Amino acid sequence: VVGSLKSQGDMPGGIVALSAGGTIKWQYEISESVSSTPVIDKDGHILFGTERGNFYILDANGTDAIAVLDVAGAIANSESAYASEWAATQGKFWSSPVVDADGTIYVAITNTQDESKSLLVALSSKYVKGLPTTGWPMRAKDAQHTATVK
């Protein structure tokens, strides 16, 4: 089981993995809060967004960030029609990412300036190859959010 941590005071945020018995297997700490459920891809990488607009891809052991994408900054500095309404530090991931079969990552990001504008962003990374064919790799089980067990 992999879950998220909110940063509070001196306590860091990040991701924690628990064994079936509830003991901590590992913890990846960052100085940002994580409000969404992480996703696990085909190779076991752990993907999540933060409340500062950064998107992390951790190795399967949860020990190293193999990619950190500044999505809020990329929107603010893009040629997009939305760029003028964003600042590099004004993005927050509240929703859980979804990864499709070809490895495209879909996630909603909210402008924290007034929290009235959100965008659905499609991300790609050479590290993400798709979803596992078994298990429960993301919130509500799959990209369709069926939340069913057969």
Where are these regions (language model features)?
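Extracytoplasmic/lumenal domain signature
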Residues: 1-150
